[in-house]
Amino acid sequence: MLQGHHRVMVVDDSPLACDFVKEGLEALGLGYEVMCFQDPYEALEQVGKVQPAIVLSDLDMPGIDGLELCWRLKESPSRQVPVIILTANDSEAERVKGLRAGADDYVNKSASMAELSARIESVMRRTSETERMRKLFARYTSDAVVEEILKSPDTVVLTGEKPEVTVLFADIRNFTGLAESLPPEQVVGVLNQVLGRLSDAVLTCGGTLDKFLGDGLMAVWGAPVHRTDDALRALQAAKMMMTAMVELRQAAQAEWAANERLGRPLVLELGIGINSGLAVAGNIGGSMRTEYTCIGDAVNVAARLCALAGPGEILAGERTRELVSHREMPFEDLPPVRLKGKQQPVPLYRVL
């Protein structure tokens, strides 16, 4: 049973029906505060101000019926508010229409207050879990990807699956020199500022921030959600990162671009490696802690390309180049390189 104070908005053109639901729920003593609206237009105007935990709406009302009200609520900034449709018409066709309009549940008006309360609790638990998942995913991936995950969970790449992904590793060059020359709190401030801008590029381009790696990061496109332009998105993110580094250097030059101890200018640069290929995606770790990540040869190659990249350089693997060859993304062919763990030289390309 849910505990605490829960504000319920009841929308019904019948004053008697509104009062019946209000008195019945409040009499249960479960912490419900019920606010009644007989005009659905007024309910739409006030939902942002009232901020209900849930909306109970009659199906048949003049002007806007319950389905239209539900649809408008789901299209508004209050779209996260769950909606239960109350009706005397409990036909399968009406239930289907209600659920397609976005209703979270469909309850017959003849149901007892105990059943209605149980339905409210069930919907609110699901909504709470969805919101928890939204906040969790939002720390690592873009809002658009979060909404896609929540809307179509069947499209999510789960543990043990092997999708084609594009992996990006970015590493800050010259950071060790900076760390040795500035106070620790200033070093942390600089690192957070840089990684914040790099993370923004990942999220803006629809990627998933896999992990921070000291003075760098790993990002993935293609898991947990696959898109046909994942490789292009990763390359666009890499270019945004390089632009961000230029802007950061210009904006903070007086603070951290000059290092008197070294007697020469200290310039932070970025090296980036990108590679595409099959990888195992899923929760990796032990019983105490796990994380959703990707592992495999494609990931290892991306990391080694990052290590090879010079300051201000973006290196990409062959599969990444193939995936965007039909788009306007200029590459420069470089001599193949030998990488640890690979028997044959690996084709290499510089992103221009």
From Swiss-Prot:
Keywords: ATP-binding, cAMP biosynthesis, Lyase, Magnesium, Metal-binding, Nucleotide-binding, Phosphoprotein. One of its GO terms (molecular function) is metal ion binding. It is an enzyme of class 4 (lyase). Residues 7-124 form the Response regulatory domain. It holds the Pfam family Guanylate_cyc. Residues 166-306 form the Guanylate cyclase domain. One of its GO terms (biological process) is cAMP biosynthetic process. Inhibited by adenosine and GTP. The keyword Metal-binding applies. PANTHER family: ADENYLATE CYCLASE, TERMINAL-DIFFERENTIATION SPECIFIC, ADENYLATE CYCLASE, TERMINAL-DIFFERENTIATION SPECIFIC-RELATED. This is Adenylate cyclase 2. It comes from Stigmatella aurantiaca.
